[in-house]
Regions:
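A structural boundary/capping signal
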Residues: 1-222
């Protein structure tokens, strides 16, 4: 086990720029024929939008990996732990009242417990830079940030979504993995839960462990 501490900066102007562009991306992706196609287009657009804005945080991970002589697996675990340490914050694309009225039992129970949420976000997902700026993220906001950082670190990664589970996790293409995986163009991507601490590569909640209930949206292989 190793401890990590890092400091990075974000700006309100860059954050607001991402918010403004996000509306256009969401409207464009909404023409998709299916929810999987929508999220694939939307996630890809959000990544491209923020690709240049996350260089500072990527450099922190890259420098740390070099200094500590980490392999790809260890570097991925470092990124995963960083995201897991950020407290959970439900993000949804409507008001809290509408989210409760149309949401599943998790959403209803979450609001009934007066837990924190971030309403009126297009598609119910924040972009990588937006999340780094305000630290408000649920499942797919976290998965997209993990994908964005790992992609820039040249580590194979993917964002998984499940209509059956109403959930999203990160996939990472590593050597000698264990646990749940999906093969993406010949490379095994191991799933990992990012909304709670302690999950390692290949580990998800028991109720979410059927790989056939997961679809791959954006991905990259190196």
């Amino acid at each position: 086990n190793q401890n990590y501490q890092a400091k990075y900066n974000t700006s309100v102007r860059s954050y607001q720029g991402s918010q403004k562009e996000q509306t256009t991306l969401s409207n464009s992706a909404s023409q998709s024929a299916s929810s999987i196609e929508y999220f694939t287009k939307y996630y890809a657009g959000l990544y491209k939008m923020d690709e240049g804005k996350i260089n500072e945080i990527v450099k922190i991970f890259k420098d740390s990996a070099v200094k500590k002589q980490m392999n790809a697996n260890e570097t991925a675990e470092m990124v995963i732990t960083f995201i897991q340490e950020i407290p959970y914050y439900l993000v949804h694309d409507e008001s809290c009242v509408k989210a409760v009225a149309s949401g599943n039992s998790f959403v209803k129970q979450y609001h009934a417990s007066n837990k924190p949420c971030f309403p009126n976000v297009k598609g119910g997902v924040q972009s990588p830079y937006e999340f780094l700026h305000n630290l408000k993220g649920d499942c797919d906001t976290r998965s997209l940030l993990g994908f964005a950082i790992l992609k820039k670190l040249k580590i194979a990664s993917s964002v998984w979504v499940s209509e059956a589970y109403g959930h999203s996790i990160l996939g990472v293409g590593v050597q000698n993995g264990h646990g749940i995986y999906k093969t993406v163009n010949g490379i095994k991507h191991y799933g990992v839960e990012l909304t709670a601490k302690g999950y390692r590569l290949g580990m998800v909640a028991p109720e979410n462990n059927n790989p056939y209930n997961w679809d791959i949206t954006v991905y990259n292989n190196y």
